[in-house]
């Protein structure tokens, strides 16, 4: 009899194995037999967890999308101000590129192969995440924290685009930790978004990079910013 922990471990082993194989050979270059052989399981074990290879690809995508959506909803429930909520949303979004880097690599390589029903399910979660972000921006503008002359949609999509591009250059062994990168993004966004009055408040300045930290980063900056494939 399989215990719950054994079943969970088997599912994770199948996912981890498929991530390596999909990244190396592509979605269509890998068969269920390949996954079964490399993960040391059986076809019965595979089909106990996944109806098909297509569902496995969906689960890989769903892992990190569900993570950022849950974190955004938690930020909404636990934050005192829109600024705090936005800081938490950006930070959790950035961290996904460290926590789920293999999943994201496969996502960007193989997302075109998602079946329509799975693509629709992913889109629902992505839209929900986007709506949470847009609502935070609206609330921040209504409360007087954020500049209300900025269009919500363009501002929100700019934040999403900036953070999404992290997958192009982030490396775990790079100069900056994922936490430092998150702090830099938060500073960039809030410096642009907060009203001048709020930026003068010590409460809101606490979200900015300290001068000593900024100086340290500047002195240690050795990478060429003109190369988009340069790891940081």
Report the location of each language-model feature.
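Short amphipathic alpha-helical elements of helix-turn-helix/winged-helix folds
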Residues: 17-21, 96, 162
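Helix-turn-helix
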Residues: 2, 13, 21-55, 59
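Short helix-capping/turn signature of helix-turn-helix
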Residues: 50, 109-114
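Amphipathic alpha-helical packing segments from all-alpha helical-bundle domains
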Residues: 66-69, 73, 117-143, 153-157, ...
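Short, intrinsically disordered C-terminal tails of secreted or membrane-associated proteins
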Residues: 225-230
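Hydrophobic alpha-helical connector segments
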Residues: 59, 74-103, 152, 156-159, ...
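Hydrophobic/aromatic-rich alpha-helical bundle segments in the mid-to-C-terminal region
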Residues: 104-109, 141-187, 196-216, 224
């Amino acid at each position: 009899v399989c215990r719950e922990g054994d079943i969970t471990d088997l599912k994770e082993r199948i996912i981890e194995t498929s991530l390596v194989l999909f990244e190396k050979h592509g979605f269509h270059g890998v068969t269920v037999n390949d996954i079964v052989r490399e993960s040391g399981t059986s076809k019965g074990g595979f089909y106990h967890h996944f109806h098909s290879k297509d569902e496995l690809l969906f689960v890989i995508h769903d892992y990190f999308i569900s993570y950022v959506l849950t974190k955004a909803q938690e930020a909404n429930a636990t934050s005192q101000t829109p600024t705090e909520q936005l800081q938490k949303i950006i930070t959790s979004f950035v961290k996904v590129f460290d926590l789920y880097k293999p999943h994201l690599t496969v996502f960007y390589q193989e997302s075109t192969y998602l079946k329509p029903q799975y693509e629709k399910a992913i889109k629902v979660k992505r839209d929900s995440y986007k709506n949470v972000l847009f609502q935070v921006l609206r609330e921040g503008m209504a409360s007087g924290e954020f500049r209300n002359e900025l269009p919500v949609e363009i501002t929100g999509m700019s934040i999403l685009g900036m953070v999404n591009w992290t997958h192009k250059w982030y490396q775990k062994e790079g100069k900056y930790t994922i936490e430092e990168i998150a702090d830099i993004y938060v500073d960039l966004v809030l410096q642009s978004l907060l009203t001048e009055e709020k930026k003068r408040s010590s409460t809101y300045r606490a979200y900015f990079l300290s001068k000593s930290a900024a100086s340290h980063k500047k002195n240690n900056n050795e990478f060429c910013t003109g190369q988009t494939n340069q790891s940081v």
